[in-house]
Amino acid sequence: MQAHLLLHLATVKLNFAPIFNRTKMNKPTPSEHIPFEKWDLDLLVDYILKFHHRNTRKYGTEIYNLLLDVDSRHHELDKVTDHFRNSIQDLDTHCTKEEQVLFPYIMNLYEAAEQNQHIMPFHCGTIEAPINMMMADHDDELSRHERIRELTNNYTAPEGAEPAYQNVLDRLKEFRDYMMEHIWIENEIVFPRALEIEETNVERY
């Protein structure tokens, strides 16, 4: 699996806007009182892995099963269920790419910077291409969950609907909110810092 991901990241051709030219995201609600900007890079990566990646997989599966149950009685949720199924499948693939390829190298960059050392370049020369891939995935998920929000009338169940209907919509909103925190931390803090360290702590010949 890891060899396949390395080959994919090394050969993919991208033409996205550079990371620093993108429109910045506003800090999401779940994290508005947490000073992530002051955290060290290794702590941020650890938080993403142990909180966001774990919970994306755990609660994504839980919510999908709840959706299947409610959708079996309320077929207007068919499209929502399809979108969410595709989301958790794509997010699992996305997280795996980060865990197996990108984040280990970012941690190496952090350790090199802490020890004032230099390390060899990423296997495809720079981490900019895989970072742009990850950010493109983020954009896709934000668009997908915006569509879910629209399809559910801003996560509002029809009048008189069973409690389980509103409960699953509340869970969908919570999932989106924490996904936005996950994306914000990576887009606005982790990736820019990693690129800055790469500029100063990677051997160039």
Q: What positions do the PLM features span?
A:
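Small-residue-biased structural context
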Residues: 1-205
